[in-house]
Amino acid sequence: MLIIELLKALFLGVVEGVTEWLPVSSTGHLILVQEFMKLNQSKSFVEMFNIVIQLGAIMAVIVIYFKRLNPFQPGKSAREIRLTWQLWLKVVIACIPSILIALPFDNWFEAHFNFMIPIAIALIFYGFVFIWVEKRNAHLKPQVTELASMSYKTAFLIGCFQVLSIVPGTSRSGATILGAIIIGTSRSVAADFTFFLAIPTMFGYSGLKAVKYFLDGNVLSLDQSLILLVASLTAFVVSLYVIRFLTDYVKRHDFTIFGKYRIVLGSLLILYWLVVHLF
C-alpha cells in the first residue's frame, strides 16, 4: 500500500536528516534501517533513493547559511564579499580530490563494500579514531579558529579526507570533521566547513546518481515520486534542527560520544550478522 511506503519514506527522511550531519554515516544508516524495514521498490530505485534524498538535507544548509554564503547579499561590505568568494574557492578546491579519486571508483566500492559487515567495520574503526583524536587534542589549541584564516592548502587536505567516505559506513561529515581537526582547525570551523563542502559534493553526487538512474532506462512512477518527495522534505525539515544542534553542541563538547556510538552500533551489527548467518 502507498500509505505504508510513504510512512517508511517519512521515517527514512528522519534518519537521513539526523545522520547526514552527525559523524555517524547517513548512507550506512539508511542501508541498515532498510535491512529491517525495506521499501517495496526496485533495487535500482532504492539505491538512487538513498543518495538523492540527501538533496533535502543539503537545502537546509543553503537556507540556514544563505546570507553567509551569498556574495551578492545586500549590505555586505567589500571585505565580506571578498571573504565569501574566498570561502567558495576553498570549497571548490576541497572538492578536487573527490572528483579525481572518489568518483572513478565509486561504483567499485559500492559493489564491494555496500554490505553490513564492511559498514560495521567502518563504523567501529572510525569510532576509535574519533576517540583517539579527541584524546590527542584534549590539551592542544586549534591553529585555525575562523574559516577566513583557513588556507587553501588546508581546504585541499580536508577534501582528501573526504575521499575516505567512499567506503560505506565511514560518514562524509565524519571524515571531513576528523580531517579538519587532525590538521588543526577548531571543532566549529570543522563543522561549518563540512556543511559548506556538502553543497557541491552532494548536489553533484546526487545529480549523477539520478542521471545514471534514468540513463539506465528507469522511470519514476507517481508513487515513487511521492516517496522521494516525502523523504526529501522530511530530511530537509529535520536537518534544519540537527544543523543548529550540532553547531551549538561543538562549542561546548567534543565528538567522543559519537565515536562511542559508532563502536556500539558497529559491534551490534556484527553480532546481528553472526546470529543470522551462523545460527
UniProtKB/Swiss-Prot annotation:
The keyword Membrane applies. One of its GO terms (molecular function) is undecaprenyl-diphosphatase activity. The keyword Hydrolase applies. It comes from the Bacteria. One of its GO terms (cellular component) is plasma membrane. One of its GO terms (biological process) is cell wall organization. InterPro entries: UppP (IPR003824). It is a multi-pass membrane protein. Pfam families: BacA (PF02673). It catalyses: di-trans,octa-cis-undecaprenyl diphosphate + H2O = di-trans,octa-cis-undecaprenyl phosphate + phosphate + H(+). It is an enzyme of class 3 (hydrolase). Its EC number is 3.6.1.27. Its main location: membrane. The chain crosses the membrane at residues 45-65, 85-105, 113-133, 188-208, 226-246, 255-275. HAMAP family: Undec_diphosphatase. Belongs to the UppP family. Bacitracin is thought to be involved in the inhibition of peptidoglycan synthesis by sequestering undecaprenyl diphosphate, thereby reducing the pool of lipid carrier available. Catalyzes the dephosphorylation of undecaprenyl diphosphate (UPP). Confers resistance to bacitracin. This is Undecaprenyl-diphosphatase. It comes from Streptococcus agalactiae serotype V (strain ATCC BAA-611 / 2603 V/R). The lineage of its organism: Bacteria, Bacillati, Bacillota, Bacilli, Lactobacillales.
